[in-house]
């Protein structure tokens, strides 16, 4: 695994619009569907990352504790040719296994990840 330093947009940054495939519902999900009266947590994750795997229980806890107070969305922008375990079916299967229901979106072109300056999971 290579060492890539994380970057993060400043808290309070205005939401960058997106419309991506939701691997949970198997429909597209638009940022317009988020409740504008609540803050949003946008996580860039992937199935195979050991750091993300380590935090599965924390992600579940955040969802359980805050699902009614904030919008929660996860986005994977990995290249599935290089990481087939990060494909939409595998994303759906992982969410089902973890018992999560918030959107897990697939950013196939990495356009949204680049817009959010996501460099690693």
Language model: regions and residue ranges:
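N-terminal "domain-start" segment that seeds a small globular fold
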Residues: 1-32
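Short loop/turn microsegments at loop-to-beta-strand junctions
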Residues: 16, 40, 120-121
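Flexible, glycine-rich phosphate/dinucleotide-binding loops
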Residues: 27, 50, 81
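Loop/turn elements at helix/coil->beta-strand transitions in domains of secreted/extracellular proteins
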Residues: 38-39, 68-71, 100-102
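Structural microenvironment flanking redox-active thiols in thiol-disulfide oxidoreductases
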Residues: 54-96
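Short, internal strand/loop/helix patches
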Residues: 92-121
